[in-house]
């Protein structure tokens, strides 16, 4: 039997860590976290952590087979400056990684017979500046 969990990707960032603690404080007992970085030791009590990459299709397949994922909080991303300097990597993580997680959610939904909640927080920065002139002002 697969274990029912809430999945949080990109958990090692500031927002991800706050989310894990808040969800745990609200009584979410079955948190599964995923990040390319290890979880800080003081947060390991809140979740079962997997150190891995959202681009790793075999890892995502393993998650589908081992866990009954009822919700996904997708926080993993390459942001701003790093994304500008590594646009191919940014596209892979931000677009292809997100698509992989959406496919995972669809598979889980099919197995469960009910929707998987997919939360994808972002900011206005996701849209970028409309043109180079606007960007140069900042």
Residue ranges and their predicted role:
Residues 28-40:
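Conserved glycine-rich Rossmann-like NAD(P)H-binding loop of the short-chain dehydrogenase/reductase
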Residues 4-26:
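N-terminal Rossmann NAD(P)H-binding glycine-rich loop of SDR-like oxidoreductase domains
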Residues 44, 82-89, 129-134:
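Conserved catalytic-core motifs of eukaryotic protein kinase domains, centered on the activation segment
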